[in-house]
Amino acid sequence: MDTKNLLKFRTSTRDYKDEKLDEAIAKKVYEIVNDEAEKLGRENLAFLLNTDGESVYKALNGVAGYRGVMIKAPAYIALDARNNDPATIVKGAYGVEEIITKLHKLGLGTCWITVSEVDEVVKQNAFNYSEGDINILLAVGYPLDDERREHSYIDRGATEDLVFLGDFDTPATDEDLE
């Protein structure tokens, strides 16, 4: 799939079925994560898979996620950056996107979760690590609503179809809005 189509059809899953990952699927996820860490270089990055979603959720609820709204999922993958080099974080983020693509092929949904404001000790308790810093967290699980994952893409509408001046009979042009 080319980048344009990837961006058009990629979805984020915020609601997951309340069931643990099947053992065979969990093994495949571990292999995907392990392969990506190997490819990117373990000296700078680690991907931590935690299939005890309940414990991660309890540890991070109220402090992680957009404005502290944590996404509840059966599993989480954390990007553990082993240094503060911005290139490491960028490389890791690309690695997470590769992982997301492979997880979607397994029928799993994913959602990025903000952890930048979470205290390091809290993150260490959630993922049991001692080296580096978790910069990115990914919720992983079976989507609650498969239909939403298969949504159809609609091209961006023209300004004239969405914005009006004074009344609904007077569409605004791009020039009007400048």
Each model region followed by its residue ranges:
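Acidic, surface-exposed loops and disordered segments
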Residues: 1-178
